[in-house]
UniProtKB/Swiss-Prot annotation:
Domain of life: Eukaryota
Alphabetical list of Pfam families matching this protein: Di19_C, zf-Di19
Cystine connections: none
Protein name (record): Protein DEHYDRATION-INDUCED 19
Annotated Basic and acidic residues bias: 196-205
Amino acid sequence: MDSEHWISRLAAAKRFYAAQLGHADRAGMEEVDMDEEVRPEFACPYCYEDHDVVSLCAHLEEEHPFEPHAAPCPICSDKIAKDMLNHITVQHGYLFKNRRRLRRFVIPGSQALSLLSRDLREAHLQVLLGGGGHRSNNSSNTTNISADPLLSSFGLSFPTSDTEETSKPPISIPDDASVIKETPAQPWDSSIDSSLTREEREQKRKQASVRATFVQDLLLTTLFGD
């Protein structure tokens, strides 16, 4: 039952992650198209070729540096007797600023993906873990996560079992038994509460193993895709 539950959550999270990436790609492409649409074109007043404002200035400088007759400005329609290029750059310089401003806000699809990285992975894990689990009070879990650089980079906090086990009351030891030394804990039991029964400790080990396998699969899926 637990494995089916995790698999269903993983599938839902992968669908959510793919949908968000697709939305980011579309958003980036729309912004690029918008930049192309709002870029106006003007006809050269001498040869009537269409250019945007930057290529028009380059065209006037190369093809029409000295024109003997007056011509209307392609932007404001004023009669310009000479030096059309100087008139456009001085009187209509705002067009260059607007074009640079539009380019500053264009986000290609590849850059849009990089902007998603942290927020999208956090949302991915929130969906996967059902809104995120509460942090365990056991300090050994925090130590294990911080020891692994991959896990610490994602900031994972594993959910514990649905029903928290209440700690058992301390057992009072009579005075005459105070000389009895405590048995040292086994190395494999150091990260598990000693007040738990053998069956409970075994169950916690199995849960930790399932979670570790799940996190490994999740990281591989996120990094390398399907």
